[in-house]
Amino acid sequence: MGRISRADILPIGLETAARNLLHSCGTLRGMSTPISLFDRPGVEALRKELRLDPTVIRRLRVDLLKHFVPDAEGLASFPAPDRLALHTLSLYHRSDSEIDGATKLLLKTATGMLIESVILRVASGRTALCVSSQVGCAAACDFCATGKMGIARNLSSAEILDQLLIAGQLLASEGRKIRNIVFMGMGEPFHNEENLYTTIESLTAPDLFHHPPTKLLVSSVGVADAMVRCARRFPTVNLALSLHSVRQEVREQLIPLARTYPLDQLREAVREVNALTRSPVMIEYLMLAGRNDSLDDARELSDWVSGLRVHVNLIPYTPIDESPHLVGSDKPTREAFSSQLKAAGIDTTLRYSLGQDIAAACGQLVRHENRKRAMGSSESSRP
């Protein structure tokens, strides 16, 4: 990947000013601000203004949001293409793994901030898309590169949806379709809760993407009350909890947010989610040598999930420069841990992490230059 300049990520104050300037310039010139394709009321108002038959908009959405045709093809029969904004993001760079089916998309917002999405092509033929919900992340997990850069801002619903549109168009050219969408990219989804819910509504809406809610997965480091709210509002959407330890002191070392949401509160949240939904909650467990990977840890995890409807996903750790003190468990340790859980009757999967050669694996969703720039901005803004 080409080197990213320091101008590629803007501090939040500069980004806000840039957004306001863009809006002001359009207003001063008397220009009509293009309507986002995802803005249903706005598109309907535009249709009435242009006196278009409803089938024109319906066909446009089918072509772009269900078949993912190229922009020019999708807009070919639309009489005022300059009045519609198909994208809020632009593709800045694409990196394809040479060892597996992962593709990292580096995307730029209208004001120059960078986010990432990752396409995961599984050997079985299934394709998943990992999307970001924020620029950076406030959770500050010790094992995560994104958390080390701090938080710049939330992504809008249109910016989250555009990750799917861009990736879908890319995959359509390969004859592939996105089957699963996982909110496991940059950011804690429940720190952007309302935009997350708006996004889910658009993803599943019959007149937009019409993506099955059962093929959506929202992963959280443990915002307990929001997990329950999400399950109540979207009972067929899957939820995942990044647990990583059932020892409170260890979890607090790995995930500072654990001080706000202790383990007993998380367990109660999983129990409530189980009562509201049919699918098990995925328990994500990063395997760290000497931290959480002993057979005693496995037994304690078995006890913690006992009586809950869960599926444990054991994840190999991908090292990051900022946390040299963390080391991933070796394969025999991971396998012994998995066997211990299975012997206790716990549904368990040993996950293989894709995209490590292109820094696309979970925890690597920001390049070193991005992290350095973001952390520098954070330090300079402190009193």
Q: Where are these predicted regions, by residue range?
A:
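Short linear Ser/Thr-Pro motifs
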Residues: 95-97, 132-133, 219-220, 242
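Intrinsically disordered, low-complexity segments enriched in serine/proline and basic residues
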Residues: 1-5, 9-11, 25
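Auxiliary Fe-S-binding modules of radical SAM enzymes
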Residues: 14-115, 271-280, 285-383
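Hydrophobic/aromatic residues in well-formed alpha-helices
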Residues: 42-46, 160, 196, 266
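Conserved AdoMet/S-adenosylmethionine-binding subsite of the radical SAM
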Residues: 168-344
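P-loop NTP-binding catalytic core
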Residues: 111-121, 125
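Short beta-strand motif preference
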Residues: 105, 117, 129-131, 239-241
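Canonical Radical SAM [4Fe-4S] cluster-binding loop centered on the CxxxCxxC motif
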Residues: 121-166
